Regions:
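Conserved Walker A/P-loop ATP-binding site and its immediately adjacent core
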Residues: 130-151
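Walker A/P-loop NTP-binding motif
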Residues: 113-126
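Walker A/P-loop
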Residues: 97-115
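Pre-Walker A adenine-sensing motif
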Residues: 79-94
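Conserved small/polar residues in nucleotide/adenosyl-binding loops
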Residues: 177-186
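Conserved nucleic-acid-binding Ia/Ib motif block in the N-terminal RecA-like helicase ATPase lobe
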Residues: 145-176
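Helicase-associated low-complexity/disordered flanking segments
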Residues: 1-82
Length: 186
């Protein structure tokens, strides 16, 4: 019996939501190779024995936002104006990065689709490839994981690549350091 596959229809309101988030960073240069020195206990093993010492201790992260406060706020004002939203007086970050963005969508409108597509667009336009999705419950976590699995072929068709994802296990955080290795830049 053939496997049932979902066919996703691109909705204009979803595209507008993605464009709004991506537009916040208009003017950000494309940079896909931001490196840093990893500060973890690293030991040679079967997964990294071929790497040089330099590669072994080098990690990969998204490039820092190069836009200044004024550029970001101008971009946000432009998007708020386009969406008939009251203009923000200032950027809000809560100490987590340069600014916090709030995308509000009704239940059942495709929020998960929107943020996965947003990740692909941020990768395409700015080279960013590391994203963290935080969810409030196990049930939602399972649904998000299933969405990533279900939408892989759909996004492969549009972007020519698949999202590599995993569910974080706080009982074994060291097992995720491999994601910062040079071989995991997608």
């Amino acid at each position: 019996m053939a496997e049932m596959k979902f066919k996703f229809t691109i909705q204009p309101y979803q595209t507008e939501a993605v464009d709004s988030v991506v537009g916040v960073f208009a003017g950000q240069p494309f940079n896909e190779h931001f490196t840093y020195r990893r500060d973890v206990e690293i030991k040679r093993d079967v997964t990294n024995w071929m790497l040089s010492d330099e590669e072994l201790y080098m990690g990969f992260a998204n490039a820092k936002v190069q836009l200044d406060y004024g550029q970001l706020l101008d971009n946000i004002h432009r998007i708020q104006g386009r969406n008939n939203i009251k203009l923000s007086d200032s950027l809000k970050s809560g100490g987590l990065g340069v600014c916090s963005l709030d995308v509000e969508m009704e239940t059942g409108t495709g929020k998960t689709y929107v943020y996965i597509k947003t990740m692909f667009e941020l990768n395409k336009l700015y080279g960013w490839s590391k994203f963290i999705v935080v969810v409030p419950s196990i049930a939602i976590r399972e649904g998000v994981q299933k969405s990533f699995e279900t939408m892989q072929e759909h996004f492969m068709e549009y972007y020519g690549k698949k999202a590599r994802f995993f569910v974080y296990n706080s009982k074994n955080p060291v097992s995720y350091t491999h994601l910062t290795l040079p071989t995991n830049r997608e």
